[in-house]
Amino acid sequence: MRLRKIAAFLMAALMALSLLACGSENETNPATSNETFISEEIVENTSAGESEHKDKEDIDRSDSAAGVPTSAPASEPQQETKVIETSKPQSKPMPKDTSAKRSDGLTENQYSKITDYLDSFYSSIGDFSVSVKPDLFASDSIEKLETTIWNSMIAVRERSLIDLHINYYNFSLRIADIRTISPSKVEIEVWESCDQQYAGLSVLSREFDIEHHFTLELGDDSIWRISNHKSECNPFYVFKYDASSNSDAKIGTVLSNIEMRNAQYGGEIKEEPACDHPYNRAAAVEYARQWVNGRNPNYKAYDALGGNCMNFASQVLHAGGIRQTDGWFFESPKRFYRSWINVDGFTAYATSASPDKLLCDVNANYYSGQPGDLILMGIDSPTNHATIICDVVKDGDGRTVDYLLCSNTSNLENFPASAYYYTNQRLVQIFGWNDVPAEKLS
């Protein structure tokens, strides 16, 4: 094919030279008739794969018609030039949430992501088997962190003396704050209340206004996912995550505490001592249930100052008839003892108080508690949280196997003590107080 092109080209050149040599008046521009004829002949004998050559000739003819000078024919054919058409890069569509806006300010998709999280959480800890809904978390790291916490809670509940599978739960949400960081990122403050029916209990356990903070990010597929989560619920704020081993760094201590506590089951129960002014347990429990999800305006609330748990417990004791003394009292927000609002401070007071101030036992068998007594708890030591026993759970033989607790920060009612991640638990038995001995008065 290429030889035929060369032959045709040489023939045209010879014809042109012969005309010049003869001094003919029929001088011809190389870009006119003969070249056109030759070009058409080449096209007629060119396969489909060489059609670009015709396009190049058409371009040359357009240039000639426009008066653009063209070069004389070369002795060898020029290389074919391929014209490659390129399309402009298309811009990537921005992710967009097209779901309806709710009255609380969230979109339906954002709200559904939060409910998906809570459904996954309660189903997992309730079934003792982690199950995560699709597209819940924005990364593997946040999913591993969350599910490690869930697994720790399951491990704690599996070791309870009662059945802590959840047969039923029902939560409600209150959206407290929405902060839009960007069109694809939003921070949401949520307050959750939840009723739970544990398999081993005949009453509902209730949580009130548990504070959550969610960060949601909108992916390229227009799906919201959770990229961060914080919760007031225990154990989320005391849990220690070991990312290198994807494990709970405290789980060994947490489970060891349960073993030591359960070892007291069936142990000796001391007889309650007599006292001049017995503790009114019924009045104490009544007060606890009244203010478990509220704050008595006669006292300062310490929720934002480390927690209101011990302040609440002290109010319960006082409502049950325990008198305020020079080592334990609340007169005003500016005049009070640390032992009134601090777990560690109260433990020190209860341990050293004389019977005319407080008659109690801080070293009793764990399973000898009664309604109105305190359960203090933590992980390394029982000094992080204070709760009130509102009811006692007994087995078929009449022996205590668990307690139903009421507390502030978090606000819980009828919550089983054995469900807490705070497994280092101390019973403080409250008996009342005695009159001041005569020798002290003299």
Regions found by a protein language model. Name each.
Residues 18-21:
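C-terminal motif of bacterial Sec signal peptides marking the signal peptidase cleavage site
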Residues 26-121:
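N-terminal, intrinsically disordered, polar/charged segments of Gram-positive cell-envelope systems
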Residues 93-163, 290, 297-301, 312-320:
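Core segments of small alpha/beta cavity-forming domains
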Residues 102, 257-338:
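N-terminal capping segments
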Residues 151-201:
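Surface-exposed, charged secondary-structure patches
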Residues 185, 333-405:
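...with weaker cross-activation on analogous glycine-rich loops/strands in unrelated enzymes
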Residues 207-262, 403-406:
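Short beta-strand edge/turn micro-motifs at domain boundaries
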Residues 404-409, 417-442:
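Low-complexity, Gly/Ser/Thr/Pro-rich intrinsically disordered linker/tail segments
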